[in-house]
């Protein structure tokens, strides 16, 4: 069993303008960490400010959730950038959220890239290094995917003096190498509440997941990513939170 209780993190602040995404006010009480969008894939200055204030109210740790500049594609499309450009877009977005946090007199605790930027970070050492370089400016941890080879990422991040937080996903199918099944493939995302609940508790209790072919894979995860996009999923997040709190 894990020695330390895992936390729950959730993507937040993804509305912008008149367009509403998620039910942050209903999910926030049940999570430990809020990954707040920074305006490129979603959010706007007003939404960022309101979401930071909401996290402060519930004493939830705030993380910056930078992505590619792609509102139409919700940041899920990979956009070619040089390593220098990757560092720049991360600096720009994290800096914006840090300023909002300072306005509300709360700290910014970590950075977790979004969508395609997150996936590209896990696949490309050059992109991972570029993100580490940007995050090092803020002196806070970077959240990445827990895999079967966490040490590889730890060694690189150590060069930049960036602590790492490792996360696992409650609602995603895993491949044998510890990476997520691409969303383009069948069964990549779990939709049945019991499947999501069981995987979350397996991660929290045993530090493992069952892969697509049924193999048990060990994952050293500090936190579990959950989603609260509809009433059913909000109830599920509450259920997972209450179960983990009893461990």
From Swiss-Prot:
Keywords: ATP-binding, Hydrolase, Nucleotide-binding
CDD domains: LamB_YcsF_like (cd10787)
Record's catalysed reaction(s): 5-oxo-L-proline + ATP + 2 H2O = L-glutamate + ADP + phosphate + H(+)
SUPFAM superfamilies: Glycoside hydrolase/deacetylase
EC numbers for this chain: 3.5.2.9
Keyword Cytoplasm recorded: no
EC supergroup of this enzyme: hydrolase
One of the protein's GO biological processes: carbohydrate metabolic process
GO MF annotations, alphabetized: 5-oxoprolinase (ATP-hydrolyzing) activity; ATP binding
InterPro entries linked: Glyco_hydro/deAcase_b/a-brl, LamB/YcsF/PxpA-like
Oligomer and partners: Forms a complex composed of PxpA, PxpB and PxpC.
Family: Belongs to the LamB/PxpA family.
Its job: Catalyzes the cleavage of 5-oxoproline to form L-glutamate coupled to the hydrolysis of ATP to ADP and inorganic phosphate.
Protein's name in the database: 5-oxoprolinase subunit A
Species whose genome carries this gene: Vibrio vulnificus (strain CMCP6)
Upper classification of the organism: Bacteria, Pseudomonadati, Pseudomonadota, Gammaproteobacteria, Vibrionales
